[in-house]
Amino acid sequence: ATSNSKPTQVLLATFLTFFFLLLNNVNSSDELSFTINNFVPNEADLLFQGEASVSSTGVLQLTRVENGQPQQYSVGRALYAAPVRIWDNTTGSVASFSTSFTFVVKAPNPTITSDGLAFFLAPPDSQIPSGRVSKYLGLFNNSNSDSSNQIVAVEFDTYFGHSYDPWDPNYRHIGIDVNGIESIKTVQWDWINGGVAFATITYLAPNKTLIASLVYPSNQTSFIVAASVDLKEILPEWVRVGFSAATGYPTQVETHDVLSWSFTSTLEANSDAATENNVHIARYTA
């Protein structure tokens, strides 16, 4: 569900403020924090896979663009080079994290689009799977959607209404994916062609909740989805974080441009550090 009212934005802003206060006050043993306001070609802090690159204007282009036009069957990923410790095998502690980024998806023909992009966490040595992976957003293929993947992702899926992807709902959507392309929770996404989207994804370790939210400031619409996800049961102790995107048929192409990105994670030394008030976030889901 969606909302175009200010109360939703106030709730979101209040939650995010509260989350960062939580991160700043816990006794942490490991943390990673970075902000990239403008990407540069051959960005040293990023690992590029497939056809991902940085343009001369400082935009992270996850899929191939030639002469300003998106190209068919393009797959690309960009990951932050430094691994993130998402949980501690000795103490059992699990990290909370928050990531925010702005991005644009622009299609020559907005009525038929594919395939979308995703933010994901995966093993440090994760690579683009072999085979045709466009409809799997460069994260999976038709033979590896199982627990061996060790991948958690939030997808921004632009392809819908086709039997080719029977797992998808009949609308563009934001989905939470665990080890496979079929989302465990989705919310309808009223994508704006060429609009700048502001996305925030947070994970609250004390109650194992992953929350994804997206706002289009240009028309004051927001979208929020949340699900229970146990990162310690799904991911290895160390992961890399990044983006993946893909395009499909020649008539169903789009750009996948990330304009800025920030990330903060804190591995709590005491998993009971959060109070009851810190985990009441179900009210923000639609």
From Swiss-Prot:
CDD domains: lectin_legume_LecRK_Arcelin_ConA (cd06899)
Native species: Maackia amurensis (Amur maackia)
Residue span(s) of the pro-peptide: 278-286
Protein's UniProt keywords contain Methyltransferase: no
Gene3D superfamilies, per the entry: 2.60.120.200
Signal sequence residues: 1-28
Positions annotated to bind N-acetyl-alpha-neuraminyl-(2->3)-beta-D-galactosyl-(1->4)-beta-D-glucose: 73, 115, 135, 159, 165
Chain residues that bind Ca(2+): 157, 159, 165, 168
Protein name: Bark leucoagglutinin
Presence of keyword Protein transport: no
Keywords of this entry: Calcium, Glycoprotein, Lectin, Manganese, Metal-binding, Signal
Glycosylation site residues: 89, 141, 207, 219
GO terms, molecular function: carbohydrate binding; metal ion binding
Residues where Mn(2+) binds: 155, 157, 168, 173
Family of this protein: Belongs to the leguminous lectin family.
Top-level lineage group: Eukaryota
